[in-house]
């Protein structure tokens, strides 16, 4: 069963490689890192309101004071 699964996945990759030449694939996988998402949505500056570490530009939210450090 494992061999069949590996062969199937290899065939899918080869088919995709033949269908879409390098750099011309229509639907790229969405890869969003925390840094990239901050560029699009902005981040909370120091002493601003936060709930999570990822809300802050510094990546540190003081949870009981509810502000970015």
Curated annotation (Swiss-Prot):
Expressed by the venom duct. It is found in: Secreted. It comes from Conus lividus. GO terms for molecular function: ion channel inhibitor activity; toxin activity. Belongs to the conotoxin O1 superfamily. Disulfide bonds join 43-57, 50-61, 56-68. The lineage of its organism: Eukaryota, Metazoa, Spiralia, Lophotrochozoa, Mollusca. Pfam families: Conotoxin. Residues 18-40 form a propeptide. This is Conotoxin LvVIC. One of its GO terms (cellular component) is extracellular region. The presence of a 'disulfide through disulfide knot' structurally defines this protein as a knottin. The cysteine framework is VI/VII (C-C-CC-C-C). It comes from the Eukaryota. The keyword Membrane does not apply. InterPro entries: Conotoxin. Residues 1-17 form the signal peptide. Keywords: Disulfide bond, Knottin, Secreted, Signal, Toxin.
């Amino acid at each position: 069963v494992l061999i069949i699964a590996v062969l199937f996945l290899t065939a899918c990759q080869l088919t995709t490689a033949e269908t879409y030449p390098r750099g011309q694939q229509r639907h790229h996988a969405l890869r969003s890192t925390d840094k990239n998402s901050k560029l699009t949505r902005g981040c909370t500056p120091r002493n601003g309101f936060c709930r999570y570490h990822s809300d802050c530009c510094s990546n540190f939210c003081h949870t009981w004071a509810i502000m970015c450090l």
